[in-house]
């Protein structure tokens, strides 16, 4: 799962793997 564009939950993973502010 990737959290690109967000540091919040992405795709229901419960965490963001990659965060871009």
Curated annotation (Swiss-Prot):
It comes from the Bacteria. The keyword Disulfide bond applies. There is a cross-link at residues 1-9 (3-cysteinyl-aspartic acid (Cys-Asp)). Keywords: Disulfide bond, Thioether bond. Disulfide bonds join 1-13, 7-19. The keyword Disulfide bond applies. Active against HIV-1 virus in vitro. This is Tricyclic peptide RP 71955. It comes from Streptomyces sp. (strain SP9440). The lineage of its organism: Bacteria, Bacillati, Actinomycetota, Actinomycetes, Kitasatosporales.
């Amino acid at each position: 799962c990737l959290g690109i564009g967000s540091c919040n939950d992405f795709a229901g993973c419960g965490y963001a793997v990659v965060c871009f502010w």
